[in-house]
């Protein structure tokens, strides 16, 4: 209360400061009453019986009945304090309100607080804003104020959701052939009995037509490649050394398989071993045939 009320001491009379009161205010006179020694307390005039005011200082302090503060204010604000607006929500209280004997609340109002409140004499403070009253009033309204049509416009019915296009509809996009290719998922590495996991299988290399043509041309002349030649071909075809090496291994196995099946004639070996020519049987020398066949002159 000291932060909102300022008193001006004039001898034995205390009056409210004009900072809190309006232009036409009434002074509330208080009489000093000595309680013990230098302690002084002020009681309103007529609030305490005369017998209690003349008690001896050495007696124990008596309990006093609750008193009422009657201060009247003008409804219109003064010209000096134009920042205080006169409204039902922000008007000062106290002109026609008295202290409640049961609860002991002093209603107050101020422009610093945007609402109505009450000060409790025992040190507690209860405060309630106008917004809470409005929210409570809105909660008490029935839910029937919202028509059924508005609720349906907010949340659509279950049958109004759009359905995806079916394959039989015209708007369904046709699937291309390249979209139908099934690719096998990569195989997971299986741990061995010693706990060592084998590396996963490498992805199969898809060679282009140009790469296959160049590799077949090289295989026609040389079925076995040196490391230098293998690296040279790999760089020219944008491949690595391992890919060229594996392709030549597979190509040689394919060639041998065809020869065993008889689809291809036996071709002379290519490479360094091809320099050694083998003589056909009809070109053998006479001496070789004579030594192999028995002589006619030999006796039995």
Curated annotation (Swiss-Prot):
Q: Which organism is it from?
A: Xenopus laevis
Q: Where is this region: Disordered?
A: 148-168, 251-300
SMART domains, per the entry? HOX
**Transferase among keywords:** no
Q: Which UniProt keywords apply?
A: Developmental protein, DNA-binding, Homeobox, Nucleus, Transcription, Transcription regulation
Indicate what this protein is called per its UniProt record.
Answer: Homeobox protein Hox-D1
Q: Position of motif Antp-type hexapeptide? A: 175-180
> In this entry, which stretches build a coiled coil?
none
Q: Name where it's found.
A: Nucleus
SUPFAM superfamilies found in the cross-reference section: Homeodomain-like
Tell me one GO biological process term. Answer: regulation of transcription by RNA polymerase II
Quick one: signal sequence residues? none
DNA-binding region residues: the ranges are 200-259
Keyword DNA-binding set for record? yes
Role noted for this protein? Sequence-specific transcription factor which is part of a developmental regulatory system that provides cells with specific positional identities on the anterior-posterior axis. Acts on the anterior body structures. Acts downstream of meis3 to pattern the hindbrain.
Q: What would be an example GO MF term here?
A: RNA polymerase II cis-regulatory region sequence-specific DNA binding
Where are the compositionally biased (Polar residues) regions? Answer: 286-300
Query: Which InterPro entries did the record assign?
Result: HD (IPR001356), HD_metazoa (IPR020479), Homeobox_CS (IPR017970), Homeodomain-like_sf (IPR009057), HXA1/B1/D1 (IPR046327)
One GO cellular component term of this record is: nucleus
Expressed, tissue-wise, as follows: Expression is abundant in the gastrula dorsal lip.
**Which one Pfam family would you cite for this protein?**
Homeodomain
As for family, the record states: Belongs to the Antp homeobox family. Labial subfamily.
Q: Which domain of life is it from?
A: Eukaryota
């Amino acid at each position: 209360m000291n932060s909102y009320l300022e008193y001006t001491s004039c001898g034995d009379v205390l009056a409210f400061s004009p900072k809190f009161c309006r232009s036409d205010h009434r002074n509330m006179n208080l009489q000093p009453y000595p309680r013990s020694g230098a302690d002084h307390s002020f009681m309103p005039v007529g609030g305490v019986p005369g017998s209690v005011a003349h008690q001896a200082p050495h007696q124990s302090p008596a309990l006093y009945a609750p008193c009422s503060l009657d201060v009247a204010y003008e409804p219109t604000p003064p010209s000096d304090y134009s920042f205080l607006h006169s409204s039902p929500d922000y008007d000062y209280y106290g002109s026609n309100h008295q202290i409640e004997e049961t609860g002991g609340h002093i209603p107050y109002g101020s422009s610093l607080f945007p609402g109505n409140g009450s000060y409790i004499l025992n040190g507690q403070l209860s405060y309630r804003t106008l917004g809470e009253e409005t929210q409570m009033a809105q909660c008490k309204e029935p839910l029937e104020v919202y028509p059924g049509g508005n609720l349906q416009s907010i949340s659509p019915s279950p049958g109004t959701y759009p359905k995806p296009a079916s394959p039989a509809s015209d708007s369904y996009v046709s699937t291309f052939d390249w979209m139908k290719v099934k690719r096998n998922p990569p195989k997971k590495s299986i741990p061995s009995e010693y706990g060592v996991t084998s590396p996963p299988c490498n992805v199969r290399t898809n060679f282009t037509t140009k790469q296959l043509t160049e590799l077949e041309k090289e295989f026609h002349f040389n079925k076995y490649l040196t490391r230098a030649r293998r690296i040279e071909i790999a760089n020219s075809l944008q491949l690595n050394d391992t890919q060229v090496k594996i392709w030549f291994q597979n190509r040689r196995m394919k060639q041998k398989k065809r020869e065993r099946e008889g689809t291809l004639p036996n071709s002379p070996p290519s490479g360094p071993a091809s320099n050694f020519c083998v003589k056909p049987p009809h070109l053998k020398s006479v001496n070789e045939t004579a030594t192999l066949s028995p002589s006619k002159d030999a006796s039995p």
